[in-house]
């Protein structure tokens, strides 16, 4: 009775054993590509570092006097156990791939040993068989653990010394420049034919296939990976990074393409030094690696809609960066190194948990668009006045109590939104913002709008609505805003519009509901913007005409009534 899975009589002849070697080698899964092996090794090392970092962080936790020691120990032990489990989960695919590579390397070594057992005389009669060009591939094998490293060394030593049929066919047909073999077994058949067909090499229809790349990661020219709906595992992500690095990829789009279990990027991301655009948005990443700072060519980085709570200081090394979108993460602060992004033109950190902005943000002198809305900001740094190229500032949905006077230095500013804050006033320096086109200060606590605000004569849209009981009147000089097209003053306590309102000839949208308006009457306000403008214009003209002419004073008046003694004036008035 033969061994399980082995035909009877296989071990009785050399022919049978050679066939068994062929079968066993053929039964292996496809050998991983070199890039996949390198990626797996990097992933395993990174996962170990991550586990150690989490364990160290847990060990540094200190209890308060009210917490029992044992309770803290239990919590720490649970944290360590979970970190270990997550590490093993992240390494699972990488470990399997490395085991497969080690098995292939071991089989290489065993085949070399088997080749030494065959009669050396047979190979002298066997001609060298050239491999098809398409099957020969130059690779550089990475070691897969200590066992695989020794196996590779043994295989290479045997390859250099062997002269039999196994070796001759392998060297001529399917070996690579470093001794790595594919799962092709045609060399076994060729050796067999040379030994048992009277010394003549038989023709073999099974051509060498070269290194099998069935599991290799394909990266399209546009930087997208495979099927748009396919989610990448950590090992596939790492493999794709390796391939992209070797191809010199310029664009990489991973938007929403990472499996939910992936919480960090492998350090190998730093190899993509030629990358210009990187989109890793809409995933579940918790952090960016320090290696992100090595992407010196990166001009656009989009990481919005992840769970990143902290940025590495190396983010400041992205000196070519023009666009940075970090919206919708869990950032509580920004590193001061962000001030080194001197070419940055657009920065979006909206919908995070920022309580302050670093003063270094003032170094971003080329910044044109800054979005910090929906955070926990109490103030904007005074250095924002140094962002002299700023065109758009979105700072709504925060806790701002005032705007810095330095805002007045932002002369190119066209769009300003500070809605849903706690502003009670606007800085008078805003009079310098002569290029303003849109201003939204709704849902604040404004008590008034400064008169010199109306020097911003290029204004097209103004929203001062929903300041409720605080805002009771508009500036008298609002008529200077002759380019104004939209005005929202709803939900305030405004009773009378200023006379100059009639100068707003371009006004086409007016929202004035929920105000105790008396001038103009409510029925006029309901007719729309131009009806109100016309009414106020007519009212202003009527007021001007109805003012009585003051009599001109003659020299008699100056003589008799210009003395400063009030009693004398009273006596003269009574006498007349």
Curated annotation (Swiss-Prot):
Annotated LRR repeats reside at 272-295, 296-318, 320-341, 342-364, 366-387, 389-410, 411-433, 434-456, 458-481, 482-503, 505-527
Composition bias (Low complexity) maps to 130-151
Tell me which tissues or organs this protein is expressed in.
Widely expressed.
* Polar residues composition-biased segments: 160-180
- Please verify whether the record's keywords include Repeat: yes
Q: Which UniProt keywords apply?
A: Leucine-rich repeat, Repeat
Q: What induces it?
A: By light.
Q: Which GO terms describe its biological process?
A: intracellular signal transduction; response to light stimulus
State the span of motif (GVYW): 528-535
Q: Please list where the region (Disordered) is annotated.
A: 130-181
Pfam families from the UniProt entry: LRR_1, LRR_14
| Superkingdom of the source species | Eukaryota
Protein task: Leucine-rich repeat protein that likely mediates protein interactions, possibly in the context of signal transduction.
The UniProt entry's sequence similarity note says:
Belongs to the SHOC2 family.
Q: Which PANTHER family match?
A: LEUCINE-RICH REPEAT-CONTAINING PROTEIN (PTHR48051:SF54), PTHR48051
Q: What is this protein called?
A: Plant intracellular Ras-group-related LRR protein 4
Q: What is the lineage of its organism?
A: Eukaryota, Viridiplantae, Streptophyta, Embryophyta, Tracheophyta
